[in-house]
Amino acid sequence: MAAPSELQLYPSVIHPAIQKYWDEFCELPAETLSAFSSYYPDILRAFAVSDFLALNILREPELVLSFLQSSQHQKECQLVDFRAPLAEELSGALKEDDLLRILRLFRRRMMFRIIWRDLVCLVDYQVTTREVSWLAETCIDEALSWIYRDMSQQFGEPHSTAGVKQQLVVLAMGKLGANELNVSSDIDLIFTFPERGETQGGNRSLDNQAFFTRLGQRLIQALDNTTADGFVFRVDMRLRPYGQSGALALSFAAMEAYYQEQGRDWERYAMIKARAVAGDIDAGEELLTSLKPFVYRKYIDFGAVQALRAMKEMIEREVQRKGQDGNIKVGRGGIREIEFIVQVFQLMRGGRDVRLQQRNLLSTLECLEDEGLLPVAAAAELREAYIFLRNLEHAIQGLEDKQTQEIPKDEEGRERVAVAMGFPGWGACRVQLDKYRDCVSEHFADIIAERREAPLERPDTIEWKALWAGRLAQDEAQDLLLRSGCDQAQEIYEAVTQLRQSSRVQHMQLQGKERLDEFMPNLLQSLAQSRASHETCRRLLALVEAVLRRSAYLALLNENPGALTELIRLFAESAWIARQIVTTPLLLDELLHSGSLYTPPDTTALRDELRQQMLRIPNDDLEEQMEALRYFKKAHVLRVAASDLRETLPLMKVSDYLTFIAETIIEQVVDEAWETMVKKYGEPGYEDAALNDMRFAVIGYGKLGGIEMSYGSDLDLVFLHGASGDLSTSGETSIANQVFFTRLGQRIIHLLTTKTASGDIYEVDMRLRPSGNSGLLVSSVSAFQQYQEKSAWTWEHQALVRSRAVAGCPGIRAEFEKVRKDILTQHRDPAKLRTEVMDMREKMHASLGTKPDSSGSPPYFDLKHDRGGIVDIEFMVQYAALRWANEYPQIVVWSDNIRILEALGDAGVFSQEDADKLCDIYRLLRAHGHRLALQNLPARIQTDELLEERRWVVAFWEKVFAE
């Protein structure tokens, strides 16, 4: 049967897609086709705008026909229209498989109805988002009720210590919280409960937290797991307190304490839309009322502008890195900018004006207009743009029922989206889209965005343009370079000429070549004026070569001359920084923000930033998570190095920050690995059933443990767990606890060390674990303690001096610290200790110390391994700590050499003068090491450098180890 004449109403490029579905549709039985005949125009439109609708029509034609004949597509639903039928269907669910099947079929049926009405009937987008939100709310609440009843049969019902019955509260964040859920969105949830206590009336009692954690886990699986029938909603729990490392369900008291003591600006932003959607709704709303002072400050909070600006800048960087210019949510002039405009007023003034404490964006926008906070015209333009963008978002997502805000890359996809939007073709749709995005971007810039510096005017660049273009003779070019302050004119001229004549430049595309031709004269003039060396020029030209095929970086530098100035300075001062930026040009983005470039964030800000970045990455996108971790490390280490060069950070702070960065990444990696393992195998079993946390910790040794990391430091790690006995994990695929923790450790190492296009994060050395490479990858705390007490060598106790817990379960970390203290403060035979420490030092020097050259003298001094160097000081510190900690346990409270030396001086083990002298020399040697590392040079100096300090260390060694 030929397609109806209405086919000609659609762009020709999508005719093949429509025809394909129509041909399959025509294979249905004749009587079915006859029943559909009055709906052919709508069927044709469905084929044109949505693969999801088309596939469901072909898969379940009788169901679709019933839907059309009952006129369901013509009426708006209420919440009860979702709840009543699902509750009735679930009343017959006898086992969990029934629950999962019924939920998924119900979701598919109702989502078909919603998307049909949205894309075929063109109902108001607010009707669509409200109905999707009601669908999600219904599925969550009905699934929760079924699972709660099922669990209560085994464990009884939760009660507070006062005997009051307890229910889980499910808080919806984001779009669901505001009743604005997209047709293909995931749902952001937080689980909480009123009070601690335990279950009553079951075969086995559980404390409330354990009960609600299990309940939450089963609810997530019921909604999120993909079966043969599909899924219900993808669930994201990362907005809960402490993120992925936090408990799945917290009591109200714990929730309030977290937000009052540790809540971040971005969490204020997230809580604006929070709403209780399932479980004890009344209790949930009471909790949210108690949290309002955290979200809405009593004073006018202008700091909210900077917080949202920082969030937006972070998103912009991500958009640039991922090439998401076509993303109508996070891209320029997109939905997120409108949300930020509205929410900045809410956060600033919501504490003083309760009318701004709304979840719905359009209602809040109207309030801003009424209050005169936004001009009437601006509010109208933003409202119109928002509705257009949300409709476009639905058209994009409804195409395949996928969560995406990216404009289709293919012509057919764009034309289908345009048809769904009511346009004759993509061209007209794009014109309207560009108009709205420009409008939103302008309003955002007026209200929130910082002004970018204007391109620097350079009236004297004619000569530099001629030099780059090759229009100057060599002597003229070199004279220009010399006159402008460049001493190595010939070398620079030759390097520039070689680049210009290279095949890569000759074969550049037009846009890239134009950007290069604009950039190079500015670069050359800036180089000359800064009196840059040939080496600096060589480094910068290497960067230019690296970005020839990614000329957007050249555009970035053309538009931000301040960034070019910073770039030249950094490249002149550090070969290491130059190498980092050449291999990872994305780091150029950091130069746009000189404020943050020279002020590295503290630990709290680091954790907060990384957590926000990871929240925006789908849970199942491992590759993107790994890339984000690698960029995070490189960007923040660059900030430390830049501050180091500018001398805004002293040596000890440099090491502190480098260590903070490592700890932050390790914490995130542990959380990611734990979540993956638990999802696959369930949680480890514990003899104490009340335990339900991670019971795993990472111990840092060496530079990490001693808070003394440098730019190229690797990680010396030991993994410990707190499980005992022969128990197994709780998942369907159950494995022994020891196997679980071993695989967890392997996963952590994999995430840290796997080389991607961006390299690895850190190299990891596990040889300091009990029994070294032949030992278990992860030991129990008790086994670790037994090994340290009975089997460890003296050098292993030396290593323990510079160890500390850096990530994981607080309980296991505390247990390790106790073991460390007990081992380090035990009594030792002084003579035996002295001999063993000296023997180990001799072995190290013989293996790693500098060997004489043909003249019989060492050619250089190795700062670390040679006599009078860093290792000598470290060995003296470790020896003194092991020798005297039994009498002065305060010596080993800290794990870093400086504070141990200070403690040795305070205790009188070393004289105060000697302790201070050792601290000064140790800092001096390490400062030289840092400077050399920033030049990509080994930690070596000339044999006649630092002679006095080295000789003093050697003499003090003799004094310390004198019999």
Curated annotation (Swiss-Prot):
Q: Where is this region: Adenylyl transferase?
A: 461-963
| Region Adenylyl removase, residue ranges | 1-451
The enzyme's main class, written as a single word, is transferase
A single Gene Ontology CC annotation of this entry is:
cytosol
Q: Name one GO molecular function term.
A: [glutamine synthetase]-adenylyl-L-tyrosine phosphorylase activity
- The EC code for this enzyme is 2.7.7.89, 2.7.7.42
**Which Pfam families does this UniProt record tie to the protein?**
GlnD_UR_UTase (PF08335), GlnE (PF03710)
**Superkingdom to which the source organism belongs:** Bacteria
Q: Which reaction does it catalyse?
A: [glutamine synthetase]-O(4)-(5'-adenylyl)-L-tyrosine + phosphate = [glutamine synthetase]-L-tyrosine + ADP; [glutamine synthetase]-L-tyrosine + ATP = [glutamine synthetase]-O(4)-(5'-adenylyl)-L-tyrosine + diphosphate
List the keywords (alphabetical). ATP-binding, Magnesium, Multifunctional enzyme, Nucleotide-binding, Nucleotidyltransferase, Transferase
- Listed cofactors: Mg(2+)
Q: Which GO terms describe its biological process?
A: regulation of glutamine family amino acid metabolic process
User: What function is annotated for this protein?
Assistant: Involved in the regulation of glutamine synthetase GlnA, a key enzyme in the process to assimilate ammonia. When cellular nitrogen levels are high, the C-terminal adenylyl transferase (AT) inactivates GlnA by covalent transfer of an adenylyl group from ATP to specific tyrosine residue of GlnA, thus reducing its activity. Conversely, when nitrogen levels are low, the N-terminal adenylyl removase (AR) activates GlnA by removing the adenylyl group by phosphorolysis, increasing its activity.
Q: What family classification does the UniProt entry report for this protein?
A: Belongs to the GlnE family.
Q: Would you tell me the protein name for this molecule?
A: Bifunctional glutamine synthetase adenylyltransferase/adenylyl-removing enzyme
